[in-house]
């Protein structure tokens, strides 16, 4: 028999979360962002749950080809654009929209001389300072793109650095509007946080990512508690052993946890080789949460490669074989991430290939 650990991808949750975005931005079209293999969920697994989107946004050409192979006929956006001129024919072959964020990418399009017309999203750097033309360069870049015979539609695009924080987006919106004043074309700027909290940024297209998977843009689960978002990934295992500790007994490598009373500790078949965060805290006051048979308890000791240990004090009836939820329904992934010094995004993307993964489909009961 295989180890009892299993991940489940919930297509009904994905469809629900897409509908939440629709309600938040009813006048906008939606790029469903599925980069990084759909934030670790798997493009093949999420496709049915997200195919009501207006388009898909991703990074890799291989992911775009996969979507076409799955039957997607709508728009696909390469969020980082092309990386070499040899990619240009694939834009035509697979009918892809590409971001253009630098002089070099414009030059690639010129040199490749595609038949066109290609749809592009011209990226403006409004303060994130990763990709994009600076405001002083943007209008000239737009004029150049407009005169290129291979380019058809041009969407104005930017990305927010602080939509999930108190600083907000006003300074970036102001820079965007100044740089694009009187330039025709649609606009795409809202990420997940802006979809939820900045309706002035919704415009023609929105680009939700983490909220499609039920995670919080801020990393704080309570910030999205009233939105109706649902976790699209759950990670489950079982107790495979139980130890009865006496006061002074320690648990795990480094003896980081010391029992201050007689207590039962359960051993769970899950470790950092499965994608569970090694830095999850299992001592002190802010220990990582775990559900044992639906009851919330805490990690004890360090995370090992293949195992973790949990406090069974709230679960006196727990025994070998009792189900454990590492994250998912009833236990937000962001809560685990917060106790591990990271964010839910990273935990989603870090799910290990060795973990068996099943899909709760749109046509089956989502009961896992």
Curated annotation (Swiss-Prot):
GO terms for biological process: D-alanine biosynthetic process. GO terms for molecular function: alanine racemase activity; pyridoxal phosphate binding. Transmembrane segments: none annotated. SMART domains: Ala_racemase_C. Pathway: Amino-acid biosynthesis; D-alanine biosynthesis; D-alanine from L-alanine: step 1/1. The modification N6-(pyridoxal phosphate)lysine is found at residue 35. InterPro entries: Ala_racemase, Ala_racemase/Decarboxylase_C, Ala_racemase_C, Ala_racemase_N, Ala_racemase_pyridoxalP-BS, PLP-binding_barrel. Substrate binds at residues 130, 305. Its cofactor is pyridoxal 5'-phosphate. Keywords: Isomerase, Pyridoxal phosphate. It is an enzyme of class 5 (isomerase). The active site is at 35 (proton acceptor), 253 (proton acceptor). It catalyses: L-alanine = D-alanine. One of its GO terms (cellular component) is cytosol. Its EC number is 5.1.1.1. Belongs to the alanine racemase family. NCBIfam families: alr (TIGR00492). Catalyzes the interconversion of L-alanine and D-alanine. May also act on other amino acids. This is Alanine racemase.
